[in-house]
C-alpha cells in the first residue's frame, strides 16, 4: 500500500533546465544531496531593482516548497517574480527524486522532511537568518513538509519559531484526499491537520473554490484547526482551480500576500523592509479589466468572499 500511495503522491516531471550557476547543493540527514537556489531581492542576474527602503534593512526570506509535478527549473521564473513583487529573498529546493536529485533515490514523506530540514538549516546556520524572518511557503504537496517544519520549530525548546506559514492549496492529509477519511490512519502521509494545530506562527491559507484536485473543504477544515490567534484572513477565490489562483488572479494574490507580510511578519521584524511597494499595485488599465500578464495561461472573472478579501481584524 505504501508504494502505491507514494506513486500517487509523487510524480516528478522530466528534469527541467536550469543553469548550473544558479544552483547549489544541500546535504540531507539521510545522506542524499539535493539542489537548491537562492534569489536575493534586488540582486537577480544583471537586473537591479532600486531598493524600496534603506539598505540597512533586510528582506524576509521565503522558504518555498513546490508542488507535485514541478522541479526547480519549472518554478524559477515564478520565484523570481515573487521576490521582485513581495520584496523578499526566496530559497527553493528540490525533493529527493526530483530534478537533478532524481538519481538520489525515490521521494517519500520522510525524505521530504529531511529535505526541508536541510534547506532550513542552510538559512539558519549558514546564512544566519533569524527564524522570525523566515516564512515557509508550501504549494499543494509542498504544504506537507512546510507544515511539518512549522510544527517542529513551534514545539522545539531548542529552536526559535518561524515567522509565518503560507499554505497554497493545502490538504488535511493524503488519506483524507484519497479515501475521504475522517481521522489520521496508520500509513497516512503528511498529516497537515495534526501538525497545523501546534503551529505558533501566523498562517495564511490560499485556495481556489473550484479546486477539483484538493477540494476547498480541506482548507476550510484546516482554518478551524489553526489556533485562533494565528489565523490570518484566508484567500479563498471563486471560480479558481488548483493551479490558477496565482496566475489568473495575480493582482489580488499579490495584494493579499503583501498585506499578510506587512501585518504579521514585517511588523514583528524591526530589521526587515518596513513597507514594500509592489509594482503590481500600479497595474495598467487593461489588467484591471481582466488582462492577464504574459506568465499567465488564461484569464477568468472572479469574486471573493468578504471574509477573505478584506484584511479586517475579525480573524
Task: Give the positions of each predicted feature.
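C-terminal catalytic histidine-bearing segment of alpha/beta-hydrolase fold enzymes
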Residues: 216, 220-224, 228-315
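Alpha/beta-hydrolase active-site loop
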Residues: 106-128, 148, 194
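Short beta-strand/loop motif that positions the catalytic acidic residue
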Residues: 198-200, 204-207, 211
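The serine-hydrolase catalytic nucleophile loop
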Residues: 67-82, 103-104
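Conserved alpha/beta-hydrolase
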Residues: 83-104
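Short beta-strand element of the alpha/beta-hydrolase
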Residues: 58-67
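Primarily recognizes the serine-hydrolase "nucleophile elbow" in alpha/beta-hydrolase
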Residues: 121-126, 131-179, 198
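An N-terminal hydrophobic leader/cap segment in hydrolases
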Residues: 1-46, 271, 293-296, 300-304, ...
